[in-house]
Each structure stands twice: as C-alpha cells, then as structure tokens.
C-alpha cells in the first residue's frame, strides 16, 4: 500500500476582511515555486476567500494538478476542552461558544481527520496532497498525528504559507516530517501577523 504525504499550509497573509493581500500573494507564489519540484496529486482548499486565492496562486506553479474545495478545511475551533482543562490564558478565547457550536467544530475536526489523515485506499504509488487551510486545522492534524490529547491543538501556531508535512503509512504511526517551515520565504515575509516579540 502506498503512503500519503500531506503538505499542510496556512493561507497567505490576509487583510481584516479575509482577502489575500499583496504580501499574501507573494508568499503563496514563493511556496508555489518550492512545491513545483514535488509530485503533487491534488490541491485541496478551504472555502474561505483567503484560502481560495492562495490555491489559485499556487496552482499557477502546478498547472496540471486538480484544485478542489474541501469543506472540512474551513476555519473553525476543532475542540473546546472542559472548563477545568482550559489553561487560564485561553479561557477568554472560548467565551461565547455554546454546546452546539462546540459539537459542530468537533464534527468538522473528526471529518477532517477521517478524510485526509489516512493512508491512500489505492495500492498504487504514494500520494501527495496539498491542503490549504487555517492555523487551527493544521494544529488539529499535527495533534492527531502525534496522538496527543485533544486539547493540545492549543498553542500550535502556523505562520502564513509555512509548510507542515505529515506522512501516513499503513504499518507505522504518522510521521511529522516538518512543522511550520518557512525556508521558502525571505525574512520580511515570515511570521506575518504575529507580534515582533515572537519572530525568531
């Protein structure tokens, strides 16, 4: 059975209305240049405009690769821990979420894992899929790959167009090959949207 290689990336930098900025397009363009050497089979993207625009920019570098929307990749909170397990620093973040919203977020997160965090069904060669999504979805997939408790998605940050690669094999647990790699970006395009204090 073949292996699945998931190339997870957060959309390029977006403005306050969720539209890709010029910087975001440049970030996506540079990532496209990096990925044009990889045998990508498909590009999947969130339905939100910033992810769609990132996919369109990336697709110019991968002209023969199909591009499709995947609803599971939409930006959402994948899991809300019980109140006693929420770190003090995160408590305000979950204010206003009710049980229905929490259940819907968990349903989407479970569907994301069921659809993409598996070995390919076909016994053919390895598959290479790009998922253009959002920080929380990347954190959830990394948490799942590491078999960490559900609340450990909190605090796993992904920068715009940073690359995270997870490999799924039939006989071993998933392998996180790289996390939040920005080597394709010059220093001024890294960590966009993050406070200067955390930029290494």
Question: Regions from the language model: what does each represent?
Answer:
Residues 1-3, 64, 75-85, 99, ...:
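Acidic, low-complexity terminal tails and accessory targeting/binding regions
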Residues 1-21:
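Mobile, glycine- and charge-enriched loop segments
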Residues 5-10, 123-133, 141:
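Beta-strand elements within well-structured catalytic alpha/beta cores of enzymes
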Residues 12, 135, 182:
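Active-site metal-binding loops of divalent metal-dependent hydrolases
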Residues 14, 29-99, 199:
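Phosphate-coordination/substrate-recognition cap region in phosphate-metabolizing enzymes
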Residues 47-48, 72, 127-136, 179:
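Short, well-ordered beta-to-alpha junction loops that form the rim of enzyme active sites
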Residues 94-126:
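Internal catalytic-core helix/loop-beta-alpha segment
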């Amino acid at each position: 059975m073949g292996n699945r290689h998931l190339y997870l990336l957060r959309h390029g930098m977006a403005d306050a209305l969720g539209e890709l900025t010029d910087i975001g397009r440049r970030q996506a363009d540079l990532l496209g240049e990096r990925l044009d050497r990889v045998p990508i089979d498909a590009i999947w993207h969130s339905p939100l405009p910033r992810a769609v625009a990132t996919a369109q920019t990336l697709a110019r570098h991968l002209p023969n690769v199909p591009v499709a929307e995947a609803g599971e990749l939409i930006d959402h909170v994948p899991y809300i821990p019980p109140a006693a397990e929420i770190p003090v620093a995160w408590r305000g973040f979950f204010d206003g979420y009710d049980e229905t919203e929490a259940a819907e977020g968990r349903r989407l997160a479970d569907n994301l894992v069921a659809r993409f965090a598996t070995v390919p069904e076909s016994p053919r060669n390895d598959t290479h899929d790009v998922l253009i999504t959002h920080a929380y979805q990347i954190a959830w997939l990394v948490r799942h790959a590491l078999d960490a408790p559900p609340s450990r998605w909190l605090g796993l940050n992904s920068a715009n167009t940073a690359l995270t690669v997870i490999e799924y094999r039939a006989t071993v647990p998933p392998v996180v090959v790289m996390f939040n790699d920005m080597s394709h970006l010059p220093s001024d395009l890294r960590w966009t949207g993050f406070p200067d204090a955390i930029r290494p």
